[in-house]
């Protein structure tokens, strides 16, 4: 049986870049890594609490963190920045305040910026979140996969693969179903493939959603 490596880690340094940009001494490395995780969790939790509803979803593609001597810079790539800016009136300022309460900044400054993704449905995180929202609202999984693939047809995507595992449609025995359109060359290292795993909480249990998107070949 073939061993499945994470497509992002497999291409790190070739077609994939790191999401955190900083250096640290060995005895201080784990503290900064924990801080990064806290910041990302805080942002995702804020989006789920204040923005995500039955009709829309956060649409965060990725979060990049850059550290300098006394500055932490967070860049949030999102497909729908208006949702984040206009939420609850204050939006980004309230989110920044939430992150500051989680961290012990000391003399450091925190800067936060929003960057709009031109084609939201070329990002696997956004597509996986859309699929999860549909499944949680009890939409049939085949219809959901078909709709997600249709959303990518008008974009620059060359191939997409979607896999959903769990008690599909409430079946007693869990199984795995998948759909693919176009090419998804997972063993070609120079192929720019984005990948995401996202869990969906349904009344029958947790469904695991995996999305692979092939964008271009370098």
Swiss-Prot record:
GO annotation terms (biological process): translation
Predominant localisation class: plastid
Cellular component, GO annotation: chloroplast; cytosolic small ribosomal subunit
All residue ranges annotated as the KH type-2 domain in the record: 47-118
InterPro entries: KH_dom-like_a/b, KH_dom_type_2, KH_sf_prok-type, Ribosomal_S3_C_sf, Ribosomal_uS3_bac-typ, Ribosomal_uS3_C, Ribosomal_uS3_CS
This protein's record includes keyword Transit peptide: no
Gene3D superfamilies, per database record: 3.30.300.20, Ribosomal protein S3, C-terminal domain (3.30.1140.32)
Transmembrane domains' residue ranges: none
Protein known as: Small ribosomal subunit protein uS3c
Organism: Anthoceros angustus (Hornwort)
């Amino acid at each position: 049986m073939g061993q499945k490596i994470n497509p992002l880690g497999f291409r790190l340094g070739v077609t994939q870049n790191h999401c955190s940009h900083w250096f640290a001494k060995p005895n201080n490395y784990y503290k900064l890594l924990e801080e990064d995780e806290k910041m990302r969790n805080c942002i995702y939790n804020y989006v789920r609490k204040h923005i995500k509803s039955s009709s829309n979803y956060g649409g965060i593609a990725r979060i990049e963190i850059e550290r300098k001597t006394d500055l932490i810079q967070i860049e949030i790539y999102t497909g729908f920045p208006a949702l984040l800016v206009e939420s609850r009136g204050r939006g980004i300022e309230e989110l920044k305040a939430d992150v500051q309460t989680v961290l012990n900044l000391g003399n450091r400054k925190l800067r936060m910026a929003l960057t709009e993704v031109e084609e939201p449905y070329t990002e696997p995180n956004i597509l996986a979140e859309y699929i999860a929202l549909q499944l949680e609202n009890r939409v049939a999984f085949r219809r959901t996969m078909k709709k997600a693939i249709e959303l990518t047809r008008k974009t620059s995507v060359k191939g997409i693969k979607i896999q959903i595992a769990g008690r599909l449609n409430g079946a007693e025995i869990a199984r795995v179903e998948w759909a693919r359109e176009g090419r998804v060359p997972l063993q070609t290292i120079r192929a720019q493939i984005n990948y995401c795993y996202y869990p969906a909480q349904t009344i029958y249990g947790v469904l695991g959603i995996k999305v692979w998107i092939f964008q271009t070949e370098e």
